[in-house]
Swiss-Prot record:
It comes from the Eukaryota. It is found in: Membrane. Keywords: Acetylation, Membrane, Phosphoprotein, Transmembrane, Transmembrane helix. It is a multi-pass membrane protein. It comes from Mus musculus. The modification N-acetylserine is found at S2. The gene is Tmem50a. PANTHER family: SMALL MEMBRANE PROTEIN-RELATED. This is Transmembrane protein 50A. InterPro entries: UPF0220.
Length: 157
């Protein structure tokens, strides 16, 4: 496999640095959409409460709130580079970001608990709703990370 990509030509004039924000935003949107698509599919396929407890949607809602909280704070506000201090300043931005990450990790851990505690350990015939809850939260979590850290704020330099 040493010469696998040697025949393909990548354009040298293609500047991926200028398109970084676009690519990261599209990738994060696709991940977020895929997460909600999976859980909607599970809710439609298993509408009865004994097959899929619909209170499990709470994890996805909390993951979505965490997604919004994480991305509401810019990296400049966390570093203290912004021109205005805002409502609580740099410390408030860091606390807000920390709470957002706590909610994101908490919803991901809760979705694993739902998968294993509610479907695998009970040896249910249908495990797909538990897998759907986990993948929904995983996709939303990774979409939030891509949207937060995949973009850059220094377009003018």
């Amino acid at each position: 496999m040493s010469g696998f990509l040697e025949g393909s030509r990548c354009s040298e004039c293609m500047d991926w640095g200028e398109k970084r924000n676009t690519i990261a935003s599209i990738a994060a949107g696709v991940l977020f959409f895929t997460g909600w698509w999976i859980i909607i599919d599970a809710a439609v396929m298993y509408p009865r409460m004994d097959q899929f407890n619909h209170s499990y949607h709470t994890c996805g809602v909390i993951a979505t709130i965490a997604f919004l909280m994480i991305n509401a704070v810019s990296n400049g506000q966390v570093r203290g580079d912004s021109y205005s201090e805002g409502c609580l300043g740099q410390t408030g931005a860091r606390i807000w970001l920390f709470i957002g990450f706590m909610l994101a990790f908490g919803s991901l851990i809760a979705s694993m608990w739902i998968l294993f505690g509610g479907y695998v350990a009970k040896e249910k015939d249908v495990v797909y709703p538990g897998i759907a809850v986990f993948f929904q939260n995983a996709f939303i979590f990774f979409g939030g990370l891509v949207f937060k850290f995949g973009r850059t704020e220094d377009l003018w330099q």
